[in-house]
UniProtKB/Swiss-Prot annotation:
The gene is apcB. The keyword Thylakoid applies. It comes from Mastigocladus laminosus (Fischerella sp.). This is Allophycocyanin beta chain. The modification N4-methylasparagine is found at N71. (2R,3E)-phycocyanobilin binds at C81.
């Protein structure tokens, strides 16, 4: 996992140079949104279960996926879906705090699509639930932090698609 600071410093270090104006602007931007990201992470942590519950209600609960024969029909499958959504929320929050999506590749996306396909987990329903979670989260953390979190939810969705 990298954070925005490490990424900027490593880029300059590899080139054997001091931080240039563009690198310093990236750091300035990262630091200027620090309080916003920490407040958002605090709100998300305090409301994680409710965020996941509302996202499921908005996107999956009354669809064919929860009816007999659907992929979330049994309690075990439903619990696995809830667990996965909570996992995505947690790692999207980590990525937002770091200002870098690399943790999502390392800890979430590597092999996930293949695993879901082999288990018969519908990718489109997963993406739909993540998009619902993005909306629910934005309504709790406000438009600016919601936009920032949205980047990482979209990154997960893109990686699954």
């Amino acid at each position: 996992m990298q954070d925005a600071i490490t990424a900027v410093i490593n880029s300059s270090d590899v080139q054997g140079k001091y931080l240039d104006t563009a690198a310093l602007e990236k750091l300035k931007s990262y630091f200027s949104t620090g309080e916003l990201r920490v407040r958002a992470a605090t709100t998300i942590a305090a409301n994680a279960a409710a965020i996941v519950k509302e996202a499921v209600a908005k996107s999956l609960l009354y669809s064919d996926i929860t009816r007999p024969g659907g992929n979330m029909y049994t309690t075990r499958r439903y619990a696995a879906c809830i667990r996965d959504l909570d996992y995505y929320l947690r790692y999207a929050t980590y990525a937002m705090l770091a200002g870098d999506p690399s943790i999502l590749d390392e800890r979430v996306l590597n092999g996930l699509k293949e695993t879901y396909n082999s288990l018969g987990v519908p990718i489109s329903a997963t993406v739909q639930a993540i998009q619902a979670m993005k909306e629910v989260t934005a309504s709790l953390v406000g438009p600016d932090a919601g936009k920032e979190m949205g980047v990482y939810f979209d990154y997960i969705c893109s990686g699954l698609s």
